[in-house]
Amino acid sequence: MKRLPLLAVLPLLCASVASASSMMSVGYFNGGGDVTAGPGGDINKLDVRQITHLNYSFGLIYNGEKEETNVALKDPAMRHQIWLSPKVQSDLAQLPVLRKQNPNLKVLLSVGGWGARGFSGAAATPETRAVFIQSAQEIVKKYGLDGIDLDWEYPVNGAWGLVESQPADRDNFTLLLKELRQAFGKAKLVTIAVGANAESPKSWVDVKAIAPLLDYINLMTYDMAYGTQYFNANLYDSKAWPTVAAADKYSVDFVVNNYLAAGLKPQQMNLGIGFYGRVPKRSVEPGIDWSKPDAQKNPVTQPYFGEQEVALFRSLGIDLKKDTYVKYNDIVKTFLNDPQKRFTGHWDDDAKVPWLSVKSAEGKTLFALSYEDPRSVAIKADYIKKRGLAGAMFWEYGADDNNQLAKQLAESLAITP
């Protein structure tokens, strides 16, 4: 297919995706591979009647990064191709059964995730991009997928030094997406997930260049607090519980406006909703500049909780020395239904999210975690409609509690299978 005719019609093709249906609800399912969400879930327990698109997560990339810990990804003969674990392969083979629940369901393979290595190398040259793209085409064809989703966290930034990156990533990502679209044409969906950080639409991804190449973009409008005592996904700023550092003054609305200012059209934008919370590991430290690539390497100098609270969380299975990601179903089970009632529930009417507090040894009210519930999800759905966005995305199916949040989202967006 010739390049110019394809690129000329792409804006029309991509814009039609959101308008052809009412709204989108893109559900990520952690089948395996994400380093924070834990082991992959059971695909046989999925109820996909509440969504329009399923992003199966994750495929990973064979790479030569020195920090790679997965031995299976180090095969030099497979470098830059997409790796699927045995479980992921088994799950993808079961998709025909899953589709019977929802014949209109679109299923994409999501490649990447937090801490996933290999993107910078795979996107670096025409040759490496060709290897990656051929691998993607083979997987999409083999499993009858509807497209591919790239979750590169993050070009240029490298997850604050966690994975390899380079300044050329921004342009190379554009080239990768351009060539990926050329390879798939209009027959398959090509989508990406992008971060909430203010630098993302400014210097990590070239929004104006990539938008015409994509069917839609999933905004990861969560993880606002970086593990500190603030909301994970506040819709707006809170007056009752203000941030300490200006660098942490993020909100969902702030992120949406940043991408709009960068040139992304609202009808190509899915608002991300996180079905989880994070317990604070440290106090906000105004001295840390999170726009710098090495920010993650800053030492933790001011723990938020005292010994009593640390011991409490440890007794609940949460180690504050590690990642403090807590799924919504565990929040319901462990925090909201705590028989000892050690946590107090709150609703912040500025931020439009619920949160929990715990008392310190001195009786001070401390921020335990924020999360989403049916009320906050419904409010975010209303925001999606008012702003004219394409729909919603959520991470992830296995974190929901009896499909409460997915069902609320579908109801609020008037999505039916």
Where are these regions (language model features)?
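Gram-negative bacterial Sec-dependent N-terminal signal peptides
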Residues: 1-19
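Glycan-recognition patch characteristic of GH18 chitinases/ENGases
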Residues: 21-140, 305-306, 312, 318-323, ...
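Surface-exposed amphipathic alpha-helices with a cationic face
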Residues: 22-25, 91-108, 112-113, 174-191, ...
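Solvent-exposed loop/turn segments at secondary-structure junctions
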Residues: 31-35, 58-63, 113-118, 147, ...
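Conserved, mostly hydrophobic/aromatic
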Residues: 54, 109, 150, 180, ...
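Substrate-binding surface in catalytic domains of secreted glycosidases
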Residues: 65-86, 155-322
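Generic structural signal for well-ordered alpha-helices
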Residues: 92-96, 133-140, 170-181, 207, ...
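Extracellular low-complexity, Gly/Ser/Thr-rich intrinsically disordered linkers
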Residues: 333-417
